[in-house]
């Protein structure tokens, strides 16, 4: 009976990690054909924001320059001029098709993320008792660690997320969030976020250290300071 009670929260933890993802993945496959049909039949024109329009124009200019260079290398005749125009037309259609697919992927990503968040929220609300048990297990595990181990864990987390080498990691996380949400990444916005977010989190982390850790466990704070020095 005790083993069964211990196994139930672990099964809940595994299900809360994989079940929402599996359901959202299945729904995504089901929505894909419907969104594709709706987008291709219901949209009379492609709507682009400034970032998407700029990106598409840059790709078109690069394509035009490459094709023009290719034709300059060949013999300059009317036949090649016609082939040049046909090549531009085909590649333009391909670029627009890719942009159209990206727009459909954006809608699918956004819809899937809403479904995933709804399932995860509902699952968490219905399983409050199991979450309480998992929380007590985590607290007991941390409580049983030595002060040195706790200080090393704090140092590892702080260096991983807030160290001098963390900006590439933050850039990867921000780009991943952009891709998951289905929003076109803006390089200037990403640069600003990479500069600001680590500073904000570092300030909050240091405030937590000196505001709470000083009263809870001064020895851990002393070990952390000695290790960092």
Swiss-Prot record:
Query: According to the UniProt entry, where is the signal peptide?
Result: none
Q: Name one GO biological process term.
A: potassium ion transport
Q: Which reaction does it catalyse?
A: K(+)(in) + H(+)(out) = K(+)(out) + H(+)(in)
Record's GO cellular component terms: chloroplast inner membrane
Enumerate the GO terms in the molecular function aspect. antiporter activity; proton transmembrane transporter activity
**Cell compartment(s), UniProt:** Plastid, Chloroplast inner membrane
**Stretches of the chain forming a coiled coil according to its record:** none
Q: Name one Pfam family in it.
A: CemA
Its membrane topology:
Multi-pass membrane protein
Question: What family does the Swiss-Prot or TrEMBL record give for this protein?
Answer: Belongs to the CemA family.
What is the protein's known function? Contributes to K(+)/H(+) antiport activity by supporting proton efflux to control proton extrusion and homeostasis in chloroplasts in a light-dependent manner to modulate photosynthesis. Prevents excessive induction of non-photochemical quenching (NPQ) under continuous-light conditions. Indirectly promotes efficient inorganic carbon uptake into chloroplasts.
Record-linked HAMAP family: CemA_PxcA (MF_01308)
Give the protein's recorded name.
Potassium/proton antiporter CemA
Question: Gene name on record?
Answer: cemA
